[in-house]
């Protein structure tokens, strides 16, 4: 490990983190944690809660205290009956192993066996009361995902040990789903969810602990009411101009004045063939890297990110693309940026959409991890490199804001004479429809995703506070923005609420925070590229620590 504990307390925190999330330890570079899963039986979870409390009382820094608060809050969610957590951990562990090392039968066999043990432990010691319908839906979705993983493993391996372990895992998943999921769940999409909610309701049952989760799981300072108000303020600020933008593009394209119709029309007209997507991204990043490093955020000289086509067996988990940080606790960190081309997932692969994906995933998430792991523009502690839900929120905020930073740069570039690197970039884009059209479409997609992320804030607050149920919120969002009910559902609920109350808000809330402090730094004479390099090198501290460090930099 390149990051070492500076005290016995920090060493104890590292040990606790490894026990709670062995898969994260493995992908962080600790090979001895391959094939391991945490044990979520209730007596063990309760003992972990006590251990976290004891360590918190001895914590030496705010980073340590808030990390422990986030870890403790996640354990409490499992104790509150959020039954989607064990299968979610298992899915994350499987795709982490598959992305990092491919089909290593011994590790995957161990992981399948550990998954069986984890699911049975939670089922036998967990909540006796029936989970709320919303939690049962989230659990069924994750169980369906695990069954898809199992099906892939059976097809991809010849190992009899792995096949046997997978068969046992399938039985355990089915038993778990029968106890904690929705009876007869088919995982067939939005229409099925509407039917379930109309029949059984869609309550998540989180109103009694939502405020606590905001404060501890994600280190928010806002109350649920304040969070909703912030989301509405963002939406009210930008939705009118976005609607005008949709009208103009729809008129130009000769299609219905709806954002999704515009998006699908662009995609249909300009989507790259699957065989060209990775090549386009690799060519694109050669130019974008130079522009980003010069104008937005510096890239450390040992930055390594591999661009790959999402394997078909992972495309269900990454329907458009994604990023993963690997060996981030070692001296040789690297990242993987995946682009999905599997036609079953109908990925959007127009040049502008792929540019947006590249900016968000690679020059947001991947660069944040790499610059932090290399201590490039700042020196994070070991505690601040241990990923948690609170720390991951920081990465979401950085990546969300990076999209609009790149948009601002493109608009500024159009107002002056292009540099040599910019001319090369424009020449490259000429092969894919030309810079003018791609810039216009990048603007549209960036603004579309901003609307989605603002809606996530409002939805997160209302649904988890029981102010609106899921279907009521979807109906409201459809009327307010014109986005389809299906899109609102998919962008607000299955992945984001499954990650816990508060996660859906992280993109916009943390992104707005970065933007606000950045403006203060610029007013005080700091350069944007220096501010962003510092912010992008701070590791994964909880929000309050991250913001405090940024404000100190901005005013110093």
Functional labels for PLM-detected ranges:
Residues 1-556:
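N-terminal maturation segment of proteins
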């Amino acid at each position: 490990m390149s990051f070492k504990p500076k005290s016995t307390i920090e060493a104890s925190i590292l040990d606790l983190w490894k026990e709670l999330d062995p898969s994260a330890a493995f992908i962080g570079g600790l090979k001895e944690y391959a094939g391991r899963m945490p044990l979520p039986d209730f007596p063990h979870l309760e003992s972990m809660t006590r251990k976290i409390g004891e360590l918190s009382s001895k914590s030496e820094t705010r980073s340590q205290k808030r990390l422990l608060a986030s870890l403790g809050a996640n354990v409490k969610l499992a104790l509150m009956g959020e039954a989607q957590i064990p299968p979610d951990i298992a899915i994350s562990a499987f795709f982490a192993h598959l992305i990092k090392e491919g089909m290593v039968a011994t590790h995957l066999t161990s992981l399948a066996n550990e998954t069986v043990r984890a699911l049975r432990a939670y089922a036998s010691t967990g909540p006796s009361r029936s989970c709320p319908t919303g939690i049962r839906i989230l659990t069924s979705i994750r169980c369906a995902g695990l069954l898809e993983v199992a099906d892939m493993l059976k097809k991809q391996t010849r190992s009899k040990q792995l096949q046997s372990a997978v068969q046992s895992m399938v039985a355990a998943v089915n038993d778990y789903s029968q106890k904690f999921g929705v009876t007869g769940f088919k995982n067939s999409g939005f229409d099925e969810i509407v039917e379930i909610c109309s029949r059984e309701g869609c309550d998540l049952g989180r109103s009694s602990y939502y405020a606590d989760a905001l404060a501890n799981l994600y280190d928010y300072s806002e109350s649920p009411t304040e969070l909703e108000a912030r989301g509405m303020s963002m939406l009210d600020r930008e939705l009118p101009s976005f609607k005008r933008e949709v009208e103009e593009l729809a008129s130009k394209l000769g299609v219905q004045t709806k954002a999704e119709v515009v998006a699908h029309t662009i995609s249909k007209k300009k989507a790259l063939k699957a065989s060209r997507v990775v090549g386009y991204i690799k060519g694109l990043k050669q130019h974008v890297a130079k522009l980003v490093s010069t104008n937005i955020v510096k890239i450390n000289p040992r930055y390594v990110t591999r661009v790959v086509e999402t394997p078909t067996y992972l495309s269900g988990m990454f329907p458009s693309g994604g990023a993963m940080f690997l060996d981030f606790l070692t001296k040789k960190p690297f990242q993987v940026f995946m682009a999905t081309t599997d036609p079953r997932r109908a990925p959007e692969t127009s040049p502008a959409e792929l540019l947006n994906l590249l900016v968000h995933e690679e020059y947001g998430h991947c660069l944040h991890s790499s610059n932090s792991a290399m201590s490039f523009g700042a020196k994070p502690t070991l505690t601040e490199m241990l990923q948690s839900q609170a720390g991951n929120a920081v990465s979401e905020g950085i990546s969300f804001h990076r999209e609009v930073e790149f948009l601002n740069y493109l608009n500024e570039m159009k107002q002056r004479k292009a540099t040599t690197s910019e001319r090369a970039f424009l020449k490259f884009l000429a092969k894919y429809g030309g810079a003018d059209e791609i810039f216009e479409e990048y603007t549209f997609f960036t603004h579309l995703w901003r609307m989605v992320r603002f809606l996530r804030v409002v939805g997160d607050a209302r649904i988890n506070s029981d102010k609106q149920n899921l279907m009521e919120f979807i109906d409201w969002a459809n009327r307010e923005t014109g986005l389809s009910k299906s899109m609102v559902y998919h962008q607000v609920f299955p992945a984001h609420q499954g990650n816990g109350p508060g996660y859906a808000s992280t993109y916009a809330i943390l992104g707005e925070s970065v933007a606000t402090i950045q403006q203060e730094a610029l007013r005080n004479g700091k350069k944007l590229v220096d501010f962003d390099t510092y912010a992008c090198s701070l590791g994964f501290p909880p929000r309050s620590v991250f913001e405090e460090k940024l404000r100190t930099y901005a005013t110093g």
